[in-house]
C-alpha cells in the first residue's frame, strides 16, 4: 500500500517537473512586456475610441472617451440582445400574391348519390344500412348505440355470415355511373363519358371522381374562364334509396372539389345539389405555403406510404390504419394500406373499440408540429361560390320529357344539373415567410456593431485574440506557482520531537 502511494507521488512529481521544464522554455513575459502588449493593442485595434483613452494626455478627455466607449458598448450589447430575443421568437410574415396565367389545371371533382344503395338489393336486406354505418366509422367517428335494434341485428348478421363481403356488396349494389345515371357530360366544350370517372369508396359508398390524377383528363387545362365541367345526373330515386333513420333524408348529388393528387374528403367539405336544381359553381385556386417548425407548424420530413403527396386527411387515414393493423391484424377497406381485409366480425370485436381508443387517447391528432399529422407545408384548395336556379324551365321540361321519354314529374324529381368553372384565370398564393432570416440577422448585428463601436468581425477576432493571450499568461503564472509550492518539503520528524522536548522542559 505504501509502495503504491509512493509511486503516485513520484508520478505526480515527474509530471510537474515536465510541466516546469516546458514552461521554462516559454518564459512568462515581464510586467513591462505585458504592459507594452496592452498598450500596443489599445492603439492598434480597429475598435474605435480605445486609442483615445490611452493616447490622450488630458485626463478629462480620457475620462470622457472612457464614458463614450463604455456607453457605446452598453448600447450595442442592448441592441444585440433585443435582436437576438426577437429572432428566437421565430416571427413570420404573410404575403399574398395573385398570379395571372393563360391556362390553369382543372381540379378533381368527386360525385356521390345521396341515396347510396339500390332499392331492390336492400329491400330484404335492411341490416346493410347499419353495417355500412359501422364500416364507415373508420373515416369519422359516429355515435353508435350498442343496445339499439340495428346494432343487435348487425351483430347477429356478422356472426352468421362470416364470408359476407360488404365491399363487393357496395360495389355491386350501390350507386353506379353509366349512361342512364349520367345523361350528359361536357368538359370545356368536348364530350366526356362515365369512362372518364374513377371509382372511389367514401362514406357515401360508391363515388366517382372526374379528372383523377391517374387519368388523361388530369393533364387538361382550362384556358377560358367561365367554362369548365358541365354534367346532368339522373339520381333515379326509385332505383336508389337510403335509411332516413340514419340522417339520409335528402335527394340529389353531393360533390367535393379537390386536388387531383389527393383523395376526396367529404366530412364537412361536401357541396350539395338537390334534384330539380341547376347548381352553378365558380371556383378559385388558392395555394398556401406554411413554414416548418419553429416558424410554422409543418414538417417537411413526413412522407406518406400510400399517397404521392402529403395531406392531413391522408395522414389521419394512415395513422388509423396502422393502429388498427397492429391491434386487429387487418386493414379496413376504406383506409389505405396493405394487409388482410377486416371482416364484419373484426369490425365489431376489434376495429370499433380501437377507433374509440384512438379518439379517447388522442393517438391520431392534427394541427401542430408535434401532433401525429401536422399541417401540410404546401396545399392547394378550391374555394367555391355556388348559386342555384330551378331546373329545368317549363320549355326545357317539355324538351327533356320528350327526349328521355319520362314524365315531367320524373324529370323534376330526379334530374340534377351541375356546372363547375373558374371565375378567373389566376391563382392566389398565400405564403408564410420568415420575418428575419439568418443573413438578415447577421447584417443587422454587423450594422449595430459598426454604428456604435465602428467594429466588425475582424475587430471581434482581435479582441478574442487579446483575451486568449492574457488568459494563456495567467495559466502559465498559476502553473509556475503550483510547481514552486510542490518543491517545499516538511521538516523531518525527529526535529518535531526535539521541539516537543524543548517545550516540555
Swiss-Prot record:
Entry membrane topology: Multi-pass membrane protein
GO biological processes: neuronal action potential; sodium ion import across plasma membrane; sodium ion transmembrane transport
Motif position, GAS motif: 454-456
Region annotated Binds the plasma membrane and stabilizes the channel in the closed state, chain positions: 1-30
GO cellular component entries: apical plasma membrane; plasma membrane
Keywords: Cell membrane, Disulfide bond, Glycoprotein, Ion channel, Ion transport, Membrane, Sodium, Sodium channel, Sodium transport, Transmembrane, Transmembrane helix, Transport
Keyword Transport applies: yes
InterPro entries membership: ENaC
Gene Ontology molecular functions: bile acid-gated sodium channel activity; ligand-gated sodium channel activity; proton channel activity
Membrane spanning residue stretches: 62-82, 460-480
Swiss-Prot/TrEMBL catalytic activity: Na(+)(in) = Na(+)(out); Li(+)(in) = Li(+)(out); K(+)(in) = K(+)(out); H(+)(in) = H(+)(out)
SUBUNIT field: Forms homotrimeric channels.
Protein role: Forms bile acid-gated sodium channels and may play a role in bile acid-dependent absorption and secretion by epithelial cells of the bile ducts. Displays high selectivity for sodium ions but can also permit the permeation of other cations. The gating could be indirect and the consequence of alterations of the membrane environment of the channel by bile acids. As a sodium channel of type II unipolar brush cells of the vestibulocerebellum, controlling the electrical activity of these cells, could play a role in motor coordination and balance.
Descriptive protein name: Bile acid-sensitive ion channel
Organism this protein belongs to: Homo sapiens
Amino acid at each position: 500500500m505504501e509502495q503504491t502511494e509512493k509511486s503516485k507521488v513520484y508520478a505526480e512529481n515527474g509530471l510537474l517537473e515536465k510541466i516546469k521544464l516546458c514552461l521554462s522554455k516559454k518564459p512568462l513575459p515581464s510586467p513591462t512586456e505585458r504592459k507594452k502588449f496592452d498598450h500596443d493593442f489599445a492603439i492598434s485595434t480597429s475598435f474605435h475610441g480605445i486609442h483615445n483613452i490611452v493616447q490622450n494626455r488630458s485626463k478629462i478627455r480620457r475620462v470622457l472617451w472612457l464614458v463614450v466607449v463604455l456607453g457605446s458598448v452598453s448600447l450595442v450589447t442592448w441592441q444585440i440582445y433585443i435582436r437576438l430575443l426577437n429572432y428566437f421568437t421565430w416571427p413570420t410574415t404573410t404575403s399574398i400574391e395573385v398570379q395571372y396565367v393563360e391556362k390553369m389545371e382543372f381540379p378533381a371533382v368527386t360525385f356521390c348519390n345521396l341515396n347510396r344503395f339500390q332499392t331492390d338489393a336492400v329491400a330484404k336486406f335492411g341490416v346493410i344500412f347499419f353495417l355500412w354505418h359501422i364500416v364507415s366509422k373508420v373515416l369519422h367517428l359516429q355515435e353508435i348505440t350498442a343496445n339499439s335494434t340495428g346494432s343487435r341485428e348487425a351483430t347477429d348478421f356478422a356472426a352468421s355470415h362470416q364470408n359476407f363481403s360488404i365491399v363487393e356488396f357496395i360495389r355491386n349494389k350501390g350507386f353506379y355511373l353509366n349512361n342512364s345515371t349520367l345523361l350528359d357530360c361536357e368538359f370545356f366544350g368536348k364530350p366526356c363519358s362515365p369512362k372518364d370517372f374513377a371509382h372511389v369508396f367514401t362514406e357515401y359508398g360508391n363515388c366517382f371522381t372526374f379528372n383523377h390524377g391517374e387519368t388523361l383528363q388530369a393533364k387538361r387545362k382550362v384556358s377560358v374562364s367561365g367554362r369548365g365541367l358541365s354534367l346532368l345526373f339522373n339520381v333515379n330515386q326509385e332505383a336508389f334509396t337510403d335509411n332516413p333513420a340514419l340522417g339520409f333524408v335528402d335527394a340529389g348529388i353531393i360533390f367535393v372539389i379537390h386536388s387531383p393528387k389527393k383523395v376526396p374528403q367529404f366530412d364537412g367539405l361536401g357541396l350539395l345539389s338537390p334534384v330539380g336544381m341547376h347548381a352553378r359553381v365558380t371556383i378559385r385556386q388558392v395555394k398556401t405555403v406554411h413554414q416548418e417548425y419553429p416558424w410554422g407548424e409543418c414538417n417537411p420530413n413526413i412522407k406518406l406510404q400510400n399517397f404521392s403527396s402529403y395531406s392531413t386527411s391522408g395522414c389521419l387515414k394512415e395513422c388509423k390504419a396502422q393502429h388498427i393493423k397492429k391491434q386487429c391484424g387487418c386493414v379496413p377497406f376504406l383506409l389505405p394500406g396493405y394487409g388482410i381485409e377486416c371482416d364484419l366480425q373484426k369490425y365489431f370485436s376489434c376495429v370499433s373499440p380501437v377507433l374509440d381508443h384512438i379518439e379517447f387517447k388522442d393517438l391520431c391528432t392534427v394541427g401542430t408540429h408535434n401532433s401525429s399529422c401536422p399541417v401540410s407545408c404546401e396545399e392547394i384548395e378550391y374555394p367555391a361560390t355556388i348559386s342555384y336556379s330551378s331546373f329545368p324551365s317549363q320549355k326545357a321540361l317539355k324538351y327533356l320529357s320528350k327526349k328521355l321519354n319520362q314524365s315531367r314529374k320524373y324529370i323534376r324529381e330526379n334530374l340534377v344539373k351541375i356546372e363547375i368553372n373558374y371565375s378567373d384565370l389566376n391563382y392566389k398564393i398565400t405564403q408564410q415567410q420568415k420575418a428575419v432570416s439568418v443573413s438578415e440577422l447577421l447584417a443587422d448585428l454587423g450594422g449595430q456593431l459598426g454604428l456604435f463601436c465602428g467594429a466588425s468581425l475582424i475587430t471581434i477576432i482581435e479582441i478574442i485574440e487579446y483575451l486568449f493571450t492574457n488568459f494563456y499568461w495567467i495559466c502559465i503564472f498559476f502553473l509556475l506557482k503550483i510547481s514552486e509550492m510542490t518543491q517545499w518539503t516538511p521538516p523531518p520528524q525527529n526535529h518535531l520531537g526535539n521541539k516537543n522536548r524543548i517545550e516540555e522542559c
